[in-house]
Amino acid sequence: YFQNWQMAQLRAFANEQHQQEALHGHGHGGDSDSNKKARAGLCGVLRERKVVELARAKRRLVEVPYTATLANAANALLAGRVSAVTVAAPPGHWIGAGGSLIVESDPATGAARKHYIGMVNMLDILTHIAETGHDDDDDASAVKDGGGSPPVDLDRRMSVPVSSVIGHSLEGLTLWTLHPNTSLLDCMETFSKGVHRALVPLESSADNVVAVELVESAPVYRMLTQMDVVRFLRAHGAELGGVLSRTVRELGAASEAVLAVASRTKVIEAIRTMRAASLTAVPVVDAPMDAYPGTAALFVRQGRGKKVVETFSATDLRDCPVAQLRSWLGASVAEFKDKVAEYRRDGSRPLDAEEEPPRPREMVTCSFQSTLGEVIEKAAASHVHRLWVVDGEGEEEGLLRGVVSLTDVLRVVREAALGEDRELHDIVSS
């Protein structure tokens, strides 16, 4: 049943034409319209544009039925090349994540066809494995990982229904929707508070525009992410004014509290640490493990001031083939990264238009002196959700000083827009 479901989705993805006009600013009146928006100011631009414009450019949802196993969900993430999958169930039998009631309805009759009960990402799946990794400690064939063992009976762990891991990560606790007529400014408020993605109905049954909703019924939904909004900002840089030329330090866009792992940290321990801190990525730093006695969890509090060499993220976890999970989770982060890179180079995974073909991933960093425009360009071009802030010269070149996430980018752009708007009102009223 699941294979038929998955194949039907993949065929739909292959046949669907990706409409990129909304993300690249075409089809909205040309230069004269752009000039009008520029005169309206940054806040005016972000208030005028609606999330449905971006959502229409997105492909169909990647989803799995509530009966799918964790192995099915992991394969769907890999095949669809997405960070999260929605979980669908028959209507009337479930309470959605966070008490949500998001229903796909029949376009002709309005009758409910399916209920989206939550989202699951690879970190949710691997967290489930990590948390239950000590259940089989008495098994003589346990795989040693230096600080805890992945379960020997991985097949049993991966055969549980995907619905059982909804909400394992902080992001999965609630399933959000945005009304299609929500302005980008209001969307950015939601996305600047830690919400990474939300469902957007292309048509809504709700009369009143409420930016964030837990109840919705619509024939078609699309997934809108923080990256979609950042790409919009990149494509419309000329309309955003001076905020893009301001520095990371000036805008307060960086957080200096950074957790990190050593390259020799075991993957299973890194996953536990990421789950405990609600992180989807951590920097990997060049430091000997014996310099930090105890487990990796003691080390990760010492990230600032160490030389960052690469990133360990949910994307790496997603690209780990299910068949290799047992052996790869016991490897060090550095070994795991090498294995994933080799798997990508082999072209063993199917390609889809949402992301570019596999290529060696380079470190994506910035400094406190980098402009916001440079940060947005790097994030969008490299499809990364955070840039590590490093020192840029001398003996301290490459030392970790902080992190700028997409959440930070959207927060400071929104704050700049509202600040500019207040100044304009003060001038008019004076």
Regions found by a protein language model. Name each.
Residues 1-430:
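Tandem CBS (Cystathionine beta-synthase) repeat/Bateman regulatory domains
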